[in-house]
Amino acid sequence: MKNVANLEGEVYKTTNRIIQRQRMKDELNILFPEVAKQYETDLDNHIIYTHDEASTPVLKQYCMAVSLYPLLTEGVGNIDGVTPSEPNDLQSFSGQITNLIFLLSSQCKGAVAVGEYFIALNYYVVKEFGDKWYEKLDCEASSPHCLIKRTVRDNILKAFKQFVWGVNQPAGNRSYQSPFTNISYYDHTYFTSLFGEFCYPDGSKPEWIAIDTLQRMFMKWFNQIRLKQVLTFPVETFAMVHNGDDIIDLNYKQLCAEMYAEGHSFFTYISDSADSLASCCRLRNELAENTFSPTSGLTGVMTGSCNVITLNINRIVQDWALTHTLNGTPLIKGKKLIDNPLRVTVIENDLKNYVTRILERVYKYHIAFKTMLYDLEDKGMFAASNGGYIHISKLYSTIGINGLNEAARFLGMKVSNNPEYIEFLQLILGTIKEQNKLHSIHDRKRPFLFNSEVVPAEGLGGKNYKWDKEDGYVVPEDENLYNSYFYNAHDNTSILDKFILHGHQTYQYTDGGSAAHINLEDHLSKEQYLKLIDFAIANGTNYFTFNIPNSKCEDCGKIIKRPIDTCPCCGSHNITQYTRVIGYLRPTKAFGSDRQQEARNRIYSDGKSQV
């Protein structure tokens, strides 16, 4: 929705970028003077891209998954300086957690994940309706003097509404965008691992049956409410643990497939142990420790990214290729290779060394940025740190990846489930993961930890394509932007091949997550989703979601959770399609022109015939 609030956010972008770059160059001149000038050169040459560089003139972390324990003990008063106390009932909790998300989102550029939402919510449900409240869901819980009679269930649903309507409100401090909000569901195995030692401020512990009831209630309710209003947030992640053969908590496996079949949309994260956690739509946190601290409430859910710098792999690979000859003849810039004549996986050390030299500079850029964040934190400038919700030390510095498919196609490879392409993915992803570990600094006071992700690139995918084409590099003629998947979104790659491409062969080389987005033309049956969960376990596909476009009739307001041309209620053709680039649901007409063109070319698979 265009208005003066988001126009205001656009006006100062050029100024913001100038300020941010100068600040970085000043810090690099102090810490790493040998790369201070190179930073701007790398940006101007589109070798790298610093995300949200122009969104704000001040330093902010990128995204965060926070602990809610300080909210339970102190409330948001330790941030806003206004709220007099911690929440004392269900209604005040719902109000304060919404306020918290807005307060935290004002101090970061991206998402805020509240992985403990249902754990915290249960604390106040118990306070209000007593132990074993889940046995009293249909009992009336309102005074005889109340005109509106509400049951325990009604009061919980009211709390859901307050939270969801709240986080979908536009925020003035974010150019009239809603705060990007994430929540998580945990199966019994995950719950036991993450929260087995967790204690509420009053010394009590959360019961699994209570958390299970809240999670199921919310999923069912949220799925139904999206038939009345297309809601973007919260983005949901459904976490389960498997034993190598099957999901251990079979009840949650059934629930997962059931909710997909009923048309709900969420991410699924499966792991062979509860030692990692997908907190945002892309971030995977390998839990170094998972012990409960009664002073901080730490349960292993605190993580995030302080900065994202993305490598343009297509340009990097082409620059590398131009340093070689083919049969004694220099390569010509802008000419695509046929059948991988450079045999890139045979001379892999050469490309690996080339990428590593770039990475060594990028790590210095990241250290400079995070050092400035540490300095601001020491001065008390981050309310999230002051309040104990997240600390800069918990945040990763992220190496983003874009243009992988396009680089492979330049080299003459076919982007599909074939050994040559998979080896190329392993080479690039593996090099970055290896260097991330080698360059991470595990300092107790000021650690510098690195991870990687295949970035969503909602805007960057089109920018990199445009910049590379203008500068004479090879770009695919059947695309208009760079992909964010390990397959081509515009071809008919089978569903199973998509799972395989995002499976163990590649996933073991990523340390920040890369969700497989399976674009389908319609919803599958529960039995088919169960088969795909089994297939994901067998192939090590840890992180996936299913994307079926939604449709809304602009004349009568009817919402259908599949693509349609004609409204079944009023016959209107005035239909708005909603889909996901990566992560969150948006109307296609709100995309940039390049994304709208890509959306028209994207293939949505006939899953019913493939599974």
Task: Locate the predicted segments by residue.
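Long, charge-rich boundary regions
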Residues: K561, C569-V611
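Glycine-rich phosphate/pyrophosphate-binding loops
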Residues: L411-E420, K589-Q597
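Core of folded catalytic or high-affinity ligand/protein-binding domains
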Residues: I392-S393, S397-G400, R595-Q596
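Glycine-centered flexibility sites
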Residues: G400-G403, G512, G583, D594
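Contiguous, well-ordered alpha-helical segments that form the cores/surfaces of helical PPI scaffolds
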Residues: S397-F410, G430, R580
